[in-house]
């Protein structure tokens, strides 16, 4: 079994390593997290141009058909620079939910926007007193016509101020 990275993974790793090294010095990072935005849309655009945001999506969805090892390469390089752009909530969480559970219409509406960087998601899952237990879910979603009415509270939603879309966990039935 070969545990070496592929040539493409090495290229991604080298490119991201260079980007992180050039754009994420300690002082720059402090300035970015202290800014009103808390991240840099221009870096997000660069990640889209480099194909990083489209890596885990199938070619049918406009992506590059990458897998878990490709995501690991990206996350390792992001971790080295403590990158603050919303890759996890947008590409990993929202993209993963859409890829595995989204309808065809939802995929068509959102995945291309994730890939080109025009859509940014935040994940609203934590509830007051919930201690990050996803089964301890009090927020409800009641069907109303073609949509749902949400009722409940969420605790801190990291990235909500700059997100174009939210994914909200809610109970549609049961206790």
Give short role names for the model-derived ranges.
Residues 49-108, 112-118, 158-165:
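Internal helix-loop-helix
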Residues 9, 20, 74, 103, ...:
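Residue-level signal for inorganic ion chemistry
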Residues 27-49:
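Short secondary-structure junction/hinge motifs that connect adjacent elements
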Residues 2, 13-17, 28, 69, ...:
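Glycine-rich phosphate/cofactor-binding loops in nucleotide/flavin-utilizing enzymes
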Residues 117-125:
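A short, Trp-centered hydrophobic/proline-enriched beta-strand micro-motif
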Residues 124, 147, 151-175:
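A short core secondary-structure module
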Residues 139-142:
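A structural signal for short hydrophobic beta-strand segments in well-ordered beta-sheet cores
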Residues 1-8:
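Intrinsic disorder at enzyme termini
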